[in-house]
Amino acid sequence: MRERIWAPPLLLLLPLLLPPPLWGGPPDSPRRELELEPGPLQPFDLLYASGAAAYYSGDYERAVRDLEAALRSHRRLREIRTRCARHCAARHPLPPPPPGEGPGAELPLFRSLLGRARCYRSCETQRLGGPASRHRVSEDVRSDFQRRVPYNYLQRAYIKLNQLEKAVEAAHTFFVANPEHMEMQQNIENYRATAGVEALQLVDREAKPHMESYNAGVKHYEADDFEMAIRHFEQALREYFVEDTECRTLCEGPQRFEEYEYLGYKAGLYEAIADHYMQVLVCQHECVRELATRPGRLSPIENFLPLHYDYLQFAYYRVGEYVKALECAKAYLLCHPDDEDVLDNVDYYESLLDDSIDPASIEAREDLTMFVKRHKLESELIKSAAEGLGFSYTEPNYWIRYGGRQDENRVPSGVNVEGAEVHGFSMGKKLSPKIDRDLREGGPLLYENITFVYNSEQLNGTQRVLLDNVLSEEQCRELHSVASGIMLVGDGYRGKTSPHTPNEKFEGATVLKALKSGYEGRVPLKSARLFYDISEKARRIVESYFMLNSTLYFSYTHMVCRTALSGQQDRRNDLSHPIHADNCLLDPEANECWKEPPAYTFRDYSALLYMNDDFEGGEFIFTEMDAKTVTASIKPKCGRMISFSSGGENPHGVKAVTKGKRCAVALWFTLDPLYRELERIQADEVIAILDQEQQGKHELNINPKDEL
C-alpha cells in the first residue's frame, strides 16, 4: 500500500523541490565544466589529529601547520561538495512529470537521478584526488569543527610562537562560538592588554558573509545612511541565498537510519527512497533556522530573512525608490500577510507611485517569492509524509516575531511627522533605537505598593533608580526557600566556587532550572513560578520607568547568593564583586569603557532585586570611571531593587560580605532581540505547557490539590 500511496507524490514534487538554484549568483550552465584544483585533498580529521598531537608534544610550529591545514581542508571539502552538487544538478536536471501514467513512466526520473549520482561521484573523486570515503569523519570531529575547537589549540600554539596577532584572531574566532568560555574571554583581555587596546583588531575568521553584511546594514540603517544600508542588505540577501544553496547541498549526504538496525533494514524501493528523502528534506527545510543562528547560539535570530525586506522597504522609501519599496513590502507580507503596519505602508507606497504605473503590476520580490513557494511546498510534503509514513514532525514557526511590534508609533529622525500621520504611514523599523537616556526617566511603576526611593540625580549619576517593596516579605521568604532547594555552588560562574574573591562562596540558579525543579517536584511549583513571575515584573518596571519605546528583552537572569567564608574575614580589603560595567570593558586609568568583545556589548539595562538583609557588608556601590570614587552606596534589603543603564556611565560593584549570606535576583536586559536569553525562551515554553495543563485540569474539574 505504501508504494502506491507515495510513489506519485514523490515523482510529482521532486522536480519542484530539487531544481538547480535560481538565485545566489549565476547558475551553472549544463555545459560548464568545473575548474580543477591541483593536488589531492588531505582528510581534515587526520590533519586535526596530527595538529593536536603535535601541540601536546610541544611541537608548536607543526601544530600550527597541521591545524591550519585541517581548517583549509574542511573549508575546501565543503566547497567541493557544493560545487559538484550544483554542477551535476545542472547537467542532469530532473524531468517534468509525464502527462499520463503508463509503463515506464518513472524511468526518465530515475535515469536523471542515476546520471546525477554518477556525475557527483566522478566529480568528487576527481576534485578530491581520491575516493570520497576518505573524508568521512566521526561525529566527535564534526562537533569539534562546528564548535571551532581547532582555534582553541591554535591560539595557544601561536602564543608559544610569540605570534600575538594570530593568537588574538584564533582566540576571538573560538570565543564567538563559545561566548560563555570564561578562560578564553580572559585570554583575549590579556592578549589585548599586552599589545595595547588599539593595536589589535578582533577578527572572526569563520564569520558568515551574510551575517556580516546584515549587521553592517543594520548599523547604517540606524545611522540614517539609507543608501549604504540598502547596499549591505542587498549584499546580505545575495550571500544568504548562496549560503542556503550550500546548506541544502550538504544535507544531501549520507543519512543515519536510527530507527533501524542496519542488518534488519529491509525496506522496499519506495519506502527506502521515502525514508532517505524525508531526512534530507527535513534537513534542508531547517536551513532557514541554520542560517539565522549565530555561532554558539541555539536560538535563531527571530524573523531573520523577512527582516531584510522589512528594513529594505523603509530604506528604499527614504531614498525615493517607491517601486522597490513596494516590492520589498509585498515580499515581507509573503511571510506575515496580516502585518497591519506593512499593509499600511503598501497603501502609502502605492499612493506615491507615478500615475503611469499600475500598483497592481508591482509584485513581491522574485527572490523571496521563489523561496517562500519552495518553503511551503516542503512544509506540506513533510507534514503529509509524517502522517502517511508514521514519523514525528512538528513544524517550527520560522518567521516568529516575539511580543509583536512595540515601536510602531516611532518616527525616525528627518521624516515629516505630520505628513506621515496624514497618510497613515507606519514607520517603526529601528529595532535598536538610539535613546536619549537623560530625558527618558520617571515613567509609571505599574504596580501598587512599590515605593519610589531615589532617581538618577539623587543617586549622583545617569539612568539610575532605587525602588522598595517590589517584593513582599512573604515572597522573599518563598524565594529563599527556592534558592535553598536548587542552587549549586559555582552555577553561572563556570563552576568556580569563588569567581570574584576567595573569601566568599557563590551559588546560583536560573529561571529554567527553577521551573524544571518545580516540575519535577524538588521544590514547590508555585514557588518556582514566583521566580519567573517576579523577574517579568522587574522587566516591566524597568521598561516603563525608563520610558523605552521598544521591547526590553531578557539577556540573562540569575538568582545568586554569596556567603562569607568563616575564618577568612579578618582585615579584608577586597570587594565581593570588583568595580565593572555591564556592557563594556572598564579602563579606570584611561577613564574609558571599551564597548567591544569580550564584553556583553548587547546589554542595555541591569537590575538587582534583593531578597534579604540579615548579613553584614555587601553594599552595592556606584563609582566614577576611576573605579575608586564612590558616588552612591545602597544597603540591600528584602524587596529593594536598583536598576540602571548597563554602560560605562554606571560603573558598580559590591562591597565584601563579611558575615552571613546575601541573596538577590540579578537581571540583565537588552533592546536587541538578537540577544534574547535562550533559557528565558525555554522557560516561556515551560510556562505555556504548565498553563495548558492547568487549563485542562480546570476543564476536567480536577482538584488542583491532586497536582503532583
UniProtKB/Swiss-Prot annotation:
Keywords: Dioxygenase, Disease variant, Endoplasmic reticulum, Glycoprotein, Golgi apparatus, Iron, Metal-binding, Oxidoreductase, Repeat, Sarcoplasmic reticulum, Signal, TPR repeat, Vitamin C. Fe cation binds at residues 580, 582, 652. Its cofactor is Fe cation; L-ascorbate. Residues 1-24 form the signal peptide. The keyword Iron applies. It catalyses: L-prolyl-[collagen] + 2-oxoglutarate + O2 = trans-3-hydroxy-L-prolyl-[collagen] + succinate + CO2. One of its GO terms (molecular function) is L-ascorbic acid binding. The keyword Repeat applies. Belongs to the leprecan family. A motif (Prevents secretion from ER) lies at residues 705-708. It is linked to Myopia, high, with cataract and vitreoretinal degeneration: A disorder characterized by severe myopia with variable expressivity of cataract and vitreoretinal degeneration. Some patients manifest lens subluxation, lens instability and retinal detachment. The active site is at residue 662. Expression localized to the epithelia of bile ducts and to the sacroplasm of heart muscle and skeletal muscle. In the pancreas, localized to a subpopulation of Langerhans islet cells and in the salivary gland, expressed in acinar cells (at protein level). Expressed in adult heart, placenta, lung, liver, skeletal muscle and kidney. Detected in fetal heart, spleen, lung, liver skeletal muscle and kidney. Prolyl 3-hydroxylase that catalyzes the post-translational formation of 3-hydroxyproline on collagens. Contributes to proline 3-hydroxylation of collagen COL4A1 and COL1A1 in tendons, the eye sclera and in the eye lens capsule. Has high activity with the type IV collagen COL4A1, and lower activity with COL1A1. Catalyzes hydroxylation of the first Pro in Gly-Pro-Hyp sequences where Hyp is 4-hydroxyproline. Has no activity on substrates that lack 4-hydroxyproline in the third position. The gene is P3H2. SMART domains: P4Hc. Inhibited by pyridine 2,4-dicarboxylate, an analog of 2-oxoglutarate. InterPro entries: Leprecan_dom, Oxoglu/Fe-dep_dioxygenase_dom, P3H, Pro_4_hyd_alph, Pro_4_hyd_alph_FE2OG_OXY, TPR-like_helical_dom_sf. Glycans are attached at residues 449, 549. SUPFAM superfamilies: TPR-like. This is Prolyl 3-hydroxylase 2. One of its GO terms (cellular component) is basement membrane. It is found in: Endoplasmic reticulum; Sarcoplasmic reticulum; Golgi apparatus.
